[in-house]
């Protein structure tokens, strides 16, 4: 049934009904009170199109920073300004979801220089630190938490080397970076870093502890 819907979807988009729907959404963005609802609805609809099953129930037993070494291990991933400016958000999220990792937290914000400095505090002695903070706080960043078995290590493999020119073909940085100094994405490099970064960017009530009805890692 889903495949039939997927084939029909382009026709639906081309129809007058879809145009009226998108026009309504466009008007709604003019109303500040509608923005949060529309952003949430867009994320929900995108996930529904991308998967054949959805949320079953809430799993309240997982702490904010996850459980390293288990199926509920968590990693912090940030899509940087250079990616949001190039409209690569969906492409990057898809890489993690196709690998079977579960998105449990997401927000879009422009970090303050203070927040950016705290995020990169382990690099504060480096000569490039001030430039890094300035760039990271210069525009919209998509902050995310992904959950799954070995997500920290595997996430780093998906991302590629810090220097995009040294990244392997097929990694996010090799495929999508166009400038070495702007490597488009950040990912936790250890369970300790993940715990620190998740707590820095997210509160308990901003994480959705949901359980998939078609689990990949839930029972492993």
UniProtKB/Swiss-Prot annotation:
Keyword Metal-binding appears in the UniProt entry: yes
Transit peptide (first-last residue): 1-57
InterPro entries: NDK-like_dom, NDK-like_dom_sf, Nucleoside_diP_kinase, Nucleoside_diP_kinase_AS
Sorted UniProt keywords: ATP-binding, Kinase, Magnesium, Metal-binding, Mitochondrion, Nucleotide metabolism, Nucleotide-binding, Phosphoprotein, Transferase, Transit peptide
Compartments where located: Mitochondrion intermembrane space
Binding sites annotated in the UniProt record for ATP: 80, 128, 156, 162, 173, 183
The protein's required cofactors: Mg(2+)
Residues forming the catalytic site: 186
Catalytic activity: a 2'-deoxyribonucleoside 5'-diphosphate + ATP = a 2'-deoxyribonucleoside 5'-triphosphate + ADP; a ribonucleoside 5'-diphosphate + ATP = a ribonucleoside 5'-triphosphate + ADP
GO BP terms in the entry: CTP biosynthetic process; GTP biosynthetic process; nucleoside triphosphate biosynthetic process; response to bacterium; UTP biosynthetic process
Top-level lineage group: Eukaryota
The protein's Enzyme Commission number: 2.7.4.6
Enzyme class: transferase
Entry annotated with the keyword Lyase: no
Major place of residence: mitochondrion
GO molecular function, one term: nucleoside diphosphate kinase activity
Family: Belongs to the NDK family.
NCBIfam families: PRK00668.1
Function: Major role in the synthesis of nucleoside triphosphates other than ATP. The ATP gamma phosphate is transferred to the NDP beta phosphate via a ping-pong mechanism, using a phosphorylated active-site intermediate.
Name of this protein: Nucleoside diphosphate kinase, mitochondrial
Organism this protein belongs to: Dictyostelium discoideum (Social amoeba)
């Amino acid at each position: 049934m889903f495949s039939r819907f997927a084939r029909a979807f382009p026709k639906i988009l081309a129809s007058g009904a879809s145009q009226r729907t998108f026009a309504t959404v466009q008007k709604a963005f003019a109303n500040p009170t509608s923005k949060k609802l529309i952003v949430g609805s867009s994320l929900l609809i995108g996930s529904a199109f991308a998967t054949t099953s959805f949320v079953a129930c809430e799993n309240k037993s997982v702490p904010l920073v996850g459980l390293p070494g288990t199926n509920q291990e968590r990693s912090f991933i940030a899509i940087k300004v250079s990616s949001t400016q190039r409209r690569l958000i969906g492409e990057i999220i898809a890489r993690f979801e196709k690998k079977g990792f579960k998105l449990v937290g997401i927000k879009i914000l422009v970090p303050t220089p203070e927040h950016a400095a705290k995020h990169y505090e382990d690099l504060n002695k480096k000569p490039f630190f001030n430039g890094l903070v300035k760039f990271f706080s210069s525009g919209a960043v998509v902050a995310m938490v992904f959950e799954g078995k070995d997500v920290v290590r595997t996430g780093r493999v998906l991302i590629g080397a810090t220097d995009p020119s040294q990244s392997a073909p097929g990694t996010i940085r090799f495929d999508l970076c166009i400038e070495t100094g702007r490597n488009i994405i950040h990912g936790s490099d250890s369970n300790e870093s993940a715990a620190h970064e998740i707590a820095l960017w997210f509160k308990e009530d901003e994480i959705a502890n949901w359980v998939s009805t078609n689990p990949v890692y839930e029972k492993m």
